[in-house]
Amino acid sequence: MPVKRSLKLDDQFEENSFGPSKIMRKKSITAFSPTTGTYQLSPFSSPRTPKEQEHRDGPSNGTRKWSVLSSPARQDSTVKGSDGFMMLLSKIERSSEKTMEIMKNLSSLQALEGNRQLEDLLGVSLVPCSLKSEAKKTKELMTKVMKQKLFEKKNSRIPPKEHHPNSFEFLKAILN
């Protein structure tokens, strides 16, 4: 059976319902932008004073640092990084003997020597001088990589273009 429903909203409206609301919040005039005609959503979204803006953007008098990608300092950092890596490898080689001695002296490790779970736990097998040999292999690989990078850098230079004195010589060179 169809039921007809109606909303009785007439009694909820007052005479001043389309007038200003009773609850009004005072909005700061500094948060209003006459350019866009909008209010600022957050009081912290943009600086209010020019001094704050300058501090936020950094110096604009040409002393701003260039991007890391385009600066020559990036090339130096890769060289320093590879040197640092090589230094760490040499430290590992020197300390590998001490580490192997400590591992041999630990009685709990000696009891579990040859156990696969121990090797999984430590991440290395207990083969004598394995740390030293791994560090040596890594060092050799790093020197190969550095040599390859230097070789690629030398070969990546653009060869000087041949200069053709006139259009006839140029076309002749293209056809040959």
From Swiss-Prot:
InterPro entries the UniProt entry points to: CENP-R (IPR009601)
Cross-link entry Glycyl lysine isopeptide (Lys-Gly) (interchain with G-Cter in SUMO2), positions: 8, 22
Motif Nuclear localization signal positions after renumbering to this chain: 63-66
Subcellular location: Nucleus; Chromosome, Centromere; Chromosome, Centromere, Kinetochore
Record field: compositional bias (Polar residues): 34-48, 60-80
One biological process term in Gene Ontology: apoptotic process
Coiled coil (UniProt feature): 82-112
Presence of the UniProt keyword Transmembrane in the record: no
Chief location of this protein within or outside the cell: nucleus
Disulfide bond listed as a keyword: no
Region (Disordered), start-end ranges: 34-80
Motif (LXXIL motif): 171-175
Keyword vocabulary terms for this entry: Activator, Apoptosis, Cell cycle, Cell division, Centromere, Chromosome, Coiled coil, Isopeptide bond, Kinetochore, Mitosis, Nucleus, Phosphoprotein, Repressor, Transcription, Transcription regulation, Ubl conjugation
Sites of Phosphoserine modification: 17, 28, 71
Residue positions of motif LXXLL motif: 118-122
Basic and acidic residues: compositionally biased ranges: 49-58
GO CC term, one of those recorded: nucleoplasm
Pfam families attached to this UniProt entry: CENP-R (PF06729)
Top-rank taxon: Eukaryota
Assembly with partners or alone: Homodimer; mediated by the coiled coil domain. Interacts with CCNA2 and MTA1. Interacts with NFKB1 NF-kappa-B subunit. Component of the CENPA-CAD complex, composed of CENPI, CENPK, CENPL, CENPO, CENPP, CENPQ, CENPR and CENPS. The CENPA-CAD complex interacts with the CENPA-NAC complex, at least composed of CENPA, CENPC, CENPH, CENPM, CENPN, CENPT and CENPU. Interacts with TASOR.
Known role: Transcription coregulator that can have both coactivator and corepressor functions. Involved in the coactivation of nuclear receptors for retinoid X (RXRs) and thyroid hormone (TRs) in a ligand-dependent fashion. In contrast, it does not coactivate nuclear receptors for retinoic acid, vitamin D, progesterone receptor, nor glucocorticoid. Acts as a coactivator for estrogen receptor alpha. Acts as a transcriptional corepressor via its interaction with the NFKB1 NF-kappa-B subunit, possibly by interfering with the transactivation domain of NFKB1.
Domain notes: The DD1 domain (also called RepD1 domain) mediates the corepressor function and is essential in the triggering of apoptosis.
Protein name (record): Centromere protein R
Organism, as annotated: Rattus norvegicus (Rat)
